[in-house]
C-alpha cells in the first residue's frame, strides 16, 4: 500500500498544481489590465473612473454622483395606501 501511495500523492499534487496554474492564466484574462496597460481613452474606463485613479470622481457621470444624496429634480416618488408610484416630469 505504501509502495503506491507516494507516487499517487506525487501525481495528484502535480496534477492539481498544473490545473491551478492553467486556471490562473485563463482567469487573469478577465481582470482589468494593470495601470500601465490601461487604454488612455475608452467609454468603459471613463465610466468606471479607473482612467485616472487620482481624479476618479471627475470621471463618474453626474447622475451617479448626485444619486446618493437623495435629491432628484426630475422625478418624484409618492406612496399612498402601502403602494408606491413614481412619476417623472417631462
Curated annotation (Swiss-Prot):
Glycosylation sites (chain numbering): 81
Low complexity: compositionally biased ranges: 66-90
Segments of this protein annotated with the region Disordered: 56-90
Residues in the signal sequence: 1-21
Alphabetical keyword list: Glycoprotein, Signal
Protein name as annotated: Putative uncharacterized protein DDB_G0293808
Record organism: Dictyostelium discoideum (Social amoeba)
Lineage of source species: Eukaryota, Amoebozoa, Evosea, Eumycetozoa, Dictyostelia
Amino acid at each position: 500500500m505504501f509502495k503506491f501511495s507516494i507516487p499517487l500523492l506525487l501525481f495528484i499534487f502535480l496534477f492539481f498544481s498544473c490545473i491551478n496554474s492553467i486556471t490562473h492564466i485563463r482567469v487573469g484574462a478577465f481582470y482589468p489590465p494593470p495601470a500601465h496597460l490601461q487604454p488612455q481613452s475608452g467609454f468603459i474606463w471613463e465610466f468606471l473612473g479607473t482612467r485616472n485613479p487620482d481624479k476618479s470622481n471627475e470621471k463618474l457621470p453626474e447622475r451617479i454622483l448626485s444619486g446618493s444624496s437623495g435629491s432628484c429634480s426630475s422625478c418624484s416618488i409618492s406612496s399612498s395606501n402601502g403602494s408606491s408610484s413614481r412619476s417623472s416630469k417631462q
